[in-house]
Amino acid sequence: MRSSGVLMHISSLPSPYGIGTMGKEARKFVDFLDKSGQKYWQILPICPTSYGDSPYQSFSSFAGNPYFIDLEILCKEKLLKKAECESFPWGSNPHYVDYGVMYNSRYALLKKVYARFMKKQPEDFASFCEKEAEWLEDYALFMALKDAHGGIAWFEWEKELKTREQKALSEAKETYADDILFYKMLQYLFFKQWWALKEYVNEKGIEIIGDVPIYVAGDSADVWANPAQFYLDENLDPIDVAGCPPDAFSADGQLWGNPLFRWDEMKKDGYSWWTKRIKAMSKLYDIVRIDHFRGFDSYYAIPGTDDTARNGEWREGPGMDLFHALEKKLGKLNIIVEDLVFLTPSVLKLVKDSGFPGMKVVQFAFDSREGSDYLPHNYPTHCVVYTGTHDNDTILGWMNTAPKASVKFAKEYLNLTKEEGYNWGMMRGAWASVGDLAIVPMQDIIGVGSEGRMNTPSTLGGNWEWRATADQIDNKLAKRLYKYMEMYGRVRKDVKEEAKEEAKEEAKEEA
């Protein structure tokens, strides 16, 4: 079934309070998707971000980002006052998140919420904490201890806490009981709002595609609470870390720094950590997109003490053994795989054997590094087509910065014109393709340049900040988008049927 969707992270939604949230603007965006005939809303990971603000480097794989808790909903619940929200600074530019300002203002307000919340705890708060205890207990304690240590990484804590000695943990739970409850409350509020939003999305006939990074951050509750699952030495420092090897465009390669999984240990317990993770993410989202899928076939391991990726080596991953174990425990998995880099025959075989759809990126079709596999006429039907991902420049940004020969080829191949708009022409290439699903970033629909780029890999600062404003997402844009969906057979089925009924009614009235 041909379908389409839009990539728009929650942080990028309009908001008067510095960052997109799960409130009314999220519902307005869902209405926009509905009116334009979309089937899917794709978002980036919604876990709590750490110091670089990247959703791919989180303090927990299971927790939700407190930044996305909607303040107006908290006002309606009498946990905040609007005047309090308006009294804090939220950044000076409505098109970007100011994370420094965001952190200070948001947490000061959430402390006020906590004081009121604890006076009259909701009846289901205790049951929420009990139900989610398997990850929530470690996460809340981890965050409370981070605060107590001035934010330093857990592997720099005193030995008894670093190694999770039972006596030290018991004392910490008593000493920081109030802080632990604060972090549990944040998760309660997050998931209460998330499930309400997801229900609204699904009632419209729309599904959420959520990103799951293959690796977790070293400074996370995941690693602190499960050290045996990762390649750590006796001091709990990473023996090897993740990254990508050097190539013609990066002499040093990419040093990501994430600790690597100890796949041999994971196999012994039936991949229980991965089972818990995929089970949780499959509940959170309707479809899971796994980032860096090739890492399950083989992964690049770099010595933990190195400062470049030059001395790394490829090692064998778990392959289909992991996915057989997951499907045995969880049933059929709804997964999209990111299969865009270092594609060897064995990686391609793993993608094929998994049965999961892979990805095609239209921008790559005109990039000499990637070649013709990404040209739309070469796509299989069983794939997800993107104009670009969160790591790409926007279409208009690419048109202004790519080599002239690449831009010329794109113009000729897709018949790009200024009259239609270069962004609409390239999106048309994705929608017109035979790929079952086509997804385009909201920045390309709005038509912004490089200022709307979400992330530039291997750079620090200026990433994950872009935001839309309410006036950029309107009915006129939805109607234009719908026409393309109609033209290329991608209108969501129920919307198509509603449109037919409306046309019949209009014909009767005219008669």
Regions found by a protein language model. Name each.
Residues L44, E207-I209, P213, I287, ...:
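Outer-envelope exported proteins of Gram-negative bacteria
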Residues D34, W194-N202, E327, V351-K352:
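Surface-exposed amphipathic alpha-helices with a cationic face
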Residues H9, S15, D53-F191, V216-I439, ...:
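Alpha-amylase-like alpha-glycosidases and glucanotransferases acting on alpha-linked glucans and related
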Residues M1-S11, R27:
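N-terminal regions that are enriched for targeting/export leaders
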Residues G447-K500, A511:
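Structured C-terminal cap/extension of enzyme domains
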